[in-house]
Curated annotation (Swiss-Prot):
One Gene Ontology cellular component annotation held by this UniProt entry: cytosolic large ribosomal subunit
Pfam families documented for this protein: Ribosomal_L12, Ribosomal_L12_N
Record-given protein name: Large ribosomal subunit protein bL12
Biological function: Forms part of the ribosomal stalk which helps the ribosome interact with GTP-bound translation factors. Is thus essential for accurate translation.
Organism from which the protein derives: Enterococcus faecalis (strain ATCC 700802 / V583)
Entry-linked InterPro entries: Ribosomal_bL12 (IPR000206), Ribosomal_bL12_C (IPR013823), Ribosomal_bL12_C/ClpS-like (IPR014719), Ribosomal_bL12_oligo (IPR008932), Ribosomal_bL12_oligo_N_sf (IPR036235)
Similarity-based family: Belongs to the bacterial ribosomal protein bL12 family.
Length: 122
């Protein structure tokens, strides 16, 4: 008995979902294969398709000549006490504020640069 593709397709058209499911299982067992679709693993996105950054870190890279004014600006921006703000300024490069919006990061950067500090936004 020769296999005829048209006859097989005609038989499959008349089969129920349950019968087709059993057929798939039988083929998987007989030929040691899987009917599951392979899942493609996505690599890192290309530069143009990368997500836009929404959270930024403002980092003090250097205090500059007006250290006292920089400490005051850090205190105002973060709500830190004098000792903590001084520790941030003395520990430069150090993050001043993390996970802030772009607007807040730019405003903080401008305020710190206005008093002579060197600042980067990451």
């Amino acid at each position: 008995m020769a296999l005829n593709i048209e006859n097989i397709v005609a038989e499959l058209e008349t089969a129920t979902i349950l019968e087709l499911s059993e057929l798939v299982k039988a083929i998987e067992e007989k030929f040691d294969v899987s009917a599951a679709a392979p899942v493609a693993v996505a690599g890192p996105a290309a530069g143009g398709a990368a997500e836009e950054q929404t959270e930024f870190t403002v980092e003090l890279t250097a205090a500059g000549d007006q250290k006292v004014k920089v400490i005051k600006a850090v205190r105002e921006a973060t709500g830190l006490g004098l000792k903590e703000a001084k520790a941030v300024v003395d520990g430069a490069p150090a993050p001043v504020k993390e996970a802030v919006s772009k607007e807040e990061a730019e405003a903080l950067k401008a305020a710190l640069e206005e008093v002579g500090a060197s600042v980067t936004v990451k």
